[in-house]
From Swiss-Prot:
Topology within the bilayer: Multi-pass membrane protein
Record GO biological process: pilus assembly
Signal sequence bounds: 1-26
Name this protein carries in UniProt: Outer membrane usher protein HifC
Species per Swiss-Prot/TrEMBL record: Haemophilus influenzae
A Gene Ontology term for the protein's cellular component: cell outer membrane
Gene Ontology MF term list: fimbrial usher porin activity
One Pfam family linked to the record: Usher
Chief subcellular location: membrane
PROSITE patterns, alphabetized: FIMBRIAL_USHER (PS01151)
């Protein structure tokens, strides 16, 4: 192989050819005679005489069925000998994404066979349109042949398990304070770690702490190093269960009934595995259209859904759960222009579920509290079911050797608001006292929005518990104490008797916002009633924001009454800086504070705060803080001092360490599921959707949060990478499972410009307009005049390239190459391309 450096001006013509649009529109004819006769003999230019012509090869495209996006996938085009055109191959992956009825597919592809099944043969009633400029593939098909799925539905077969990896989240805080008399320091390290292998995820949480106090007299109190375990469990999801299985130490997660720590086994549903339009509560809308009609659904004056339905009964069951309450207005516009409407009551503030939907949890094991596991074996079952548009049933059972409890309740959706009620019965046994207690607890709540007036009563709840009602934690705690003191000691516990709370918010338009809340409660073992009230008002005057908060608490047992007032002002200073001031009074204590805070930096990665305060006793204090966020974590520091000679300093850091197949990467704290991003040689490139996340020296970064069972788009901004690094694509799509660690590989090249001067064994140049692919079928470049292959998409420094100007073996050749991808200069190689014998 002969190698030389090629001057830039000699490839200008070749570049212009490659940058030109190779597609021809219907009616345009490609005149092959313009290209002479020698180097282009044997090339079929007819492929360019059709609309949206495309060269054979593998492409990445956004897939649509009608107007519904199905996701991103690789698609393959190949020459169809029957039509003489380049056509789309119907692959198993494409079949899975389209989610069509069996009757729509005449010929299915074989996953074990690489033979191209052309889409025109597989789906004769469908029309495919590939828009190369926008990288979109659209399928038009009769509606009767498409499967009606809820909006946002993703087939479980497309959920991605992720990669094997390990991580450790850390949160470190060091605090030191002192005055001339006493000095103290403490260290806290919070930990949440995990290992993923296959479909299973191992998780652990815990914390380490230590402290030390020292007096001026020389006395030192050194606390013991202490590690407190949280939970440690193994978990995986199962599509068949529409939920997950957890084994180990965990906390129950029931939405109704009692929650507690347990060592054992849990099977629970996960609503995130439903399509987004099936999560939360939204009513099913049923109606009848007399003709082909347009159905519009409005809430609070806004259209939230619109669809065209044929004549006859229709059902709409894929409304997205709304964060707002408000009845739904359904309008049916017939083809003759007549409009009918009706109302469907809707409130999302009660524990409601969609019709036919089930939420469950079944857990069994040993009771845990404060990192300790007890012999008390516990069995818990929770079930919620959407019976109708208006009624949801709730139930829960709890069983141990010395405790039983059962709950039954309902949520009710009505035109005058949302109601919920439940009753819990309990049976508690205290063996050492030779006594058992049977009790009950009643609970009810009501909520409503008045959208016209802007009034929102978010919660009006009441609970009454009988004298002999005990919770599981009450029962186990008392029995532990009885055993410890041989039944001779009766600990003092406070068990609720009556509880009532209400909150109301009112929008006053230009006059601001008003918030009112109140609660009252008492205990069986304690005289008197505790009552708390709060009134808050907020508004703005030009750019000045202000708020007022009044509160009162009353303890009738002691006769103590606390009144407090809090005033705050905030003034923007421009460019993410602001000044704020506050005044508070509680009893005879008065405090005033003045501060400045803000953020700065290209991506506002730095933030600060400076404050000064004083009270009516002459006490003064000053403090400042500074924090920084970047790809590998967040760091913070603060300092304070006061007029009593107290001083303190605090240092903190939080982040994560992730170990994976490409190495070890430092990261911001990661969530339940996250993504590892790898792009070789692209250090410095920014992750589009990640706050202050960039690729490190090794081309790795971590996207700290992803949404499970949903399409997540991971984008890269290559502007800060080296200029000669080229991305095959700057956006990838993932659909992670819960607790998964996704590995997102971006294929890159050094954008090395390589010219291969190709000749055939007979000495003739390779035909112009031939295409070159690597051993994996990826497009590498086109052959221009004189048999010159302009290859700027090489990803490997050596390998084999295949050049095609037709589908027959006699119309293709291949050659071995070796280049320097780190060389920014244009390289040229004289190579003989070998044909099949």
């Amino acid at each position: 192989m002969k190698t030389k450096i090629f001057p830039l001006n000699k490839i200008a013509f070749a570049c212009s050819l490659l940058l030109a649009n190779p597609l021809a529109w219907a009616g345009d004819q490609f005149d092959a005679s313009l290209w002479g006769d020698g180097s282009v003999l044997g090339v079929d230019f007819a492929r360019f005489n059709v609309k949206n012509a495309v060269l054979p090869g593998r492409y990445e495209a956004q897939i649509y069925v009608k107007f519904e996006e199905k996701g991103v996938s690789d698609i393959i085009f190949a020459d169809n000998p029957a039509t003489g055109r380049t056509e789309l191959c119907f692959t198993p992956k494409l079949q899975e994404m389209l989610d069509l009825m069996d009757e729509a597919i005449v010929k299915s592809p074989n996953s074990e066979d690489d033979t191209c099944v052309f889409a025109s043969d597989a789906i004769p009633k469908g029309t495919f349109e590939y828009q190369s400029g926008e990288m979109k593939l659209k399928l038009e098909l009769p509606q009767a042949l498409t499967i009606r799925r809820p909006r946002g539905y993703i087939a479980p077969s497309r959920w991605q398990t992720g990669t094997n990896a390990a991580f450790a989240n850390y949160d470190i805080n060091y605090y030191r304070s002192g005055n001339p008399e006493v000095k103290s320091e403490s260290l806290y390290v919070g930990l949440r770690s995990g290992v993923n292998f296959g479909n299973w995820a191992l998780r652990h949480s815990g914390s380490f702490s230590r402290f030390e106090n020292q007096s001026s007299s020389g006395f030192t109190d050194k606390g013991k190093n202490h590690y407190e375990r949280g939970d440690t469990y193994l978990q995986r999801d199962f599509a068949l269960l529409r939920g997950n299985v957890t084994v180990g130490d965990f906390f129950s997660t029931a939405r109704i009934g009692e929650n507690f720590g347990m060592r054992g086994l849990r099977i629970a549903s996960d609503d995130r595995m439903l399509a987004p339009s099936q999560r939360g509560f939204a009513p099913v809308v049923r109606g009848v259209a007399n003709t082909n009609a347009k159905v519009s659904i409005k809430q609070n004056g806004y259209t939230i859904y619109q669809i065209t339905v044929p004549a006859g009964p229709f059902v709409i069951n894929d409304l997205y759960a709304s964060g707002y309450s408000g009845d739904l207005t359904v309008e049916i516009q017939e083809s003759d222009g007549k409009v009918r409407s009706f109302i469907v009551p809707f409130s999302n503030l009660a524990p409601l579920m969609r019709v036919g939907h089930l939420r469950y949890q079944l857990a069994g094991g040993r009771y845990r509290i404060d990192s300790r596991t007890f012999d008390e074996r516990v069995l818990q079952g929770v079930l919620q079911y959407g019976l109708t548009n208006h009624l949801t049933l709730n139930s829960s059972l709890l069983y141990t050797r010395h405790y039983r409890a059962g709950l039954f309740g309902f949520g009710l959706n009505t035109p005058i608001g949302a109601f919920s009620a439940d009753a819990t019965w309990s049976h508690a046994e205290f063996p050492l006292k030779h006594v058992s207690k049977n009790g009950y607890s009643l609970h009810g709540s009501y909520s409503i929005n008045f959208n016209e007036s802007g009034t929102n009563i978010t919660l009006a709840a009441y609970r009454y518990s009988s004298r002999d009602f005990y919770t599981l934690s009450d029962t186990i705690g008392l029995n532990r104490t009885f055993r410890q003191f041989s039944g001779a000691y009766l600990p003092e516990i406070y068990r609720p008797k009556n509880q009532f709370q209400v909150s109301l918010s009112q929008s006053l338009g230009n006059w601001g916002n008003l918030y009112l809340s109140g609660q009252t409660y008492n205990y069986w073992e304690k005289r008197g009633t505790n009552t708390q009230y709060q009134v808050a008002y907020s508004n703005s005057f030009h750019i000045l924001n202000y708020s007022v908060n009044l509160s009162q608490s009353i303890d009738k047992e002691t006769g103590k009454r606390d009144n407090s007032i809090y005033l705050s002002l905030s003034l923007p200073l421009g460019d993410n800086h602001s000044a704020d001031s506050s005044y508070s009074r509680s009893g005879n204590d008065i405090n005033q504070r003045l501060g400045v805070n803000g953020s700065f930096g290209e991506r506002h990665q730095w933030s600060y705060g400076i404050n000064a305060s004083r009270n009516n006793q002459g006490y003064r204090s000053y403090d400042g803080n500074l924090s920084h966020n970047n790809s590998i974590g967040s760091y913070r520091a603060s300092y304070s001092r006061d007029s009593l000679k107290n001083r303190s300093i605090s240092l903190g850091a939080s982040g994560a360490v992730v170990a994976h197949k490409h190495g070890i990467t430092l990261s911001q704290p990661v969530g339940e599921s996250f993504a590892i991003i790898h792009a070789k040689d692209a250090a410095g490139a920014k992750v589009e959707s990640g706050a202050n996340v960039s690729l490190d020296y090794f081309g790795n970064a971590v996207m700290p949060y992803t949404s499970p069972y949903e399409i997540n788009y991971i984008g890269i901004n290559p502007s800060d990478a080296e200029a000669n690094v080229e991305f095959e694509a700057t956006e990838r799509q993932i659909i992670p499972r819960a607790n998964s660690i996704s590995l997102v590989d971006f294929r890159t090249g050094k954008n090395t410009m390589v010219l291969f001067n190709l000749t055939l064994p007979n000495g003739e140049p390779v035909p112009m307009a031939s295409t070159a692919q690597d051993s994996e079928g990826a497009f590498v470049g086109d052959v221009v005049q004189g048999g010159v292959l302009f290859a700027n998409k090489l990803t490997q420094p050596k390998g084999e390239l295949i050049v095609k100007w037709g589908e027959r073996e006699s119309e293709q050749c291949r050659f071995q190459y070796q280049v320097d991808l780190d060389n920014a200069q244009i390289q040229s190689h004289d190579i003989q391309c070998k044909t099949a014998k």
